Amino acid sequence: MKVMIVEDEMLLAMELESEVEMAGHQVTGLAMSSSQAREQINASTPDFAFVDIHLMDGPTGIDVGRELKAAGIPYVFVSGNIKKIPEGFAGALGAIEKPYTMNGMKNALTYISAIVGGDESGSPPASLVLAEDAHVA
């Protein structure tokens, strides 16, 4: 699975990149702002994205999420305060709250990979809060 990471805290982005690669997936790019994320969406066409809500250019992650949804790319918010996510999760599959454990992220990534691959039979891990209408179109 090709994964895009949208996160303005470089250390967290690098840790997540490492976790994604150790799980056998390819990171198509790291974006720290909404403009970088838009470039990545157009340049690499990821299969999935992790998106922080607050980026270098402000609370623009929700807008990035909506652009991903419009492009048909499933995503999950990664945020320190998931209560700031709009009702319906702005089209996201769900959210992972920071701080997260590497084991929690690994379990979420395994579940997400199955969902993106078309297998919706599994149960979500505790680390992943699903949107009520979460499904991949």
Which role fits each region the language model picked out?
Residues 116-137:
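CheY-like receiver
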